[in-house]
């Protein structure tokens, strides 16, 4: 069994924020693969289904970003899911818009959602880093992540979430490099990434 966690903030006010791209990704996984209706539990919302041969629980913590770890710990504990079987989908400032990287363990790069999760379950979970780009200076970061994607961004955001959902079974299977490459090729096919980009860490 796998636990896929999308990070974001709850409520319509935040729904299209850059910080919420993790929510957007798991919403698309649920939609594309016919997962169960979302239900409220574990200080969040869950949906259940299968990706390939793996049973997968999707989780969107509704604790607000900075306390996401409480929800993740509760869900992982209930289902007896080890940190190595937890995958977190989150926004990544240090990657250009639309680029994806997958890593297991490591630092949190200043991401408060990851900080909370690491404090509750340790560092040994998988992260799917969804590039949103950096505003250029540190002082603008807070406003950048908590503002909505521009209309001009809608096409690449939709393409990215669609590609992540289409190839999500590869993450469930543990073939991270193949997943990242397939997502990269899907983005490249729509003209959103250049040929020298790749999805490897």
Curated annotation (Swiss-Prot):
GO terms for cellular component: cytoplasm. The record marks 91 as: Stabilizes the basic form of H active site to accept a proton. It comes from the Bacteria. Keywords: Cytoplasm, Hydrolase, RNA-binding, tRNA-binding. It catalyses: an N-acyl-L-alpha-aminoacyl-tRNA + H2O = an N-acyl-L-amino acid + a tRNA + H(+). One of its GO terms (biological process) is protein quality control for misfolded or incompletely synthesized proteins. InterPro entries: Pept_tRNA_hydro, Pept_tRNA_hydro_CS, Pept_tRNA_hydro_sf. The keyword RNA-binding applies. It holds the Pfam family Pept_tRNA_hydro. The record marks 9 as: Discriminates between blocked and unblocked aminoacyl-tRNA. It is an enzyme of class 3 (hydrolase). Its main location: cytoplasm. The active site is at residue 19. Its EC number is 3.1.1.29. The keyword Zinc does not apply. Belongs to the PTH family. PANTHER family: PEPTIDYL-TRNA HYDROLASE. Hydrolyzes ribosome-free peptidyl-tRNAs (with 1 or more amino acids incorporated), which drop off the ribosome during protein synthesis, or as a result of ribosome stalling. Monomer. This is Peptidyl-tRNA hydrolase. It comes from Bradyrhizobium diazoefficiens (strain JCM 10833 / BCRC 13528 / IAM 13628 / NBRC 14792 / USDA 110). The lineage of its organism: Bacteria, Pseudomonadati, Pseudomonadota, Alphaproteobacteria, Hyphomicrobiales.
